[in-house]
Curated annotation (Swiss-Prot):
Pfam families: GTP_cyclohydroI
Enzyme class: hydrolase
Protein name: GTP cyclohydrolase 1
GO biological process: one-carbon metabolic process; tetrahydrobiopterin biosynthetic process; tetrahydrofolate biosynthetic process
UniProt GO cellular component terms: cytoplasm
Source organism of the structure: Mycobacterium tuberculosis (strain ATCC 25177 / H37Ra)
Amino acid sequence: MSQLDSRSASARIRVFDQQRAEAAVRELLYAIGEDPDRDGLVATPSRVARSYREMFAGLYTDPDSVLNTMFDEDHDELVLVKEIPMYSTCEHHLVAFHGVAHVGYIPGDDGRVTGLSKIARLVDLYAKRPQVQERLTSQIADALMKKLDPRGVIVVIEAEHLCMAMRGVRKPGSVTTTSAVRGLFKTNAASRAEALDLILRK
């Protein structure tokens, strides 16, 4: 199955269960030895549940709806959006990883492009799910290939993982870089090198 995410089909029918989330947070507070009824924690289950609803909003949005606006610009060269701020949640520890995404594509033969803000929204949608960085990178690339039918797509994500910074090996400042290349960027070394040069150029 494509990395495009088998969960997409169910995104339209998922509903966040606020009550169940609050009960789970309350149980977690008991599990760590806290009293969820004390003043400082009495509203915490509700707050955490609402936060999770926002942090995982991408589970309840159909990716196709994000890329539903296209323009006939007859453009046949690279379109690159750099330094898109990105916040996601590691699915292994449910703590944040954050950084930037660089997303580029070469339009297909029809020259159609999508709005630049749509690319940022697509990054945000897939980031707002329990994730691993490798899959996140591929999902963004595959979604663009499916919807835009471009000649090529390149996605590079640079992120710091708090599961490495605040626990475990405790290496704050470590940056993980992942890439996904599709179409022309996979088969043509010159096109790939040009895109990477533009991405890495500060």
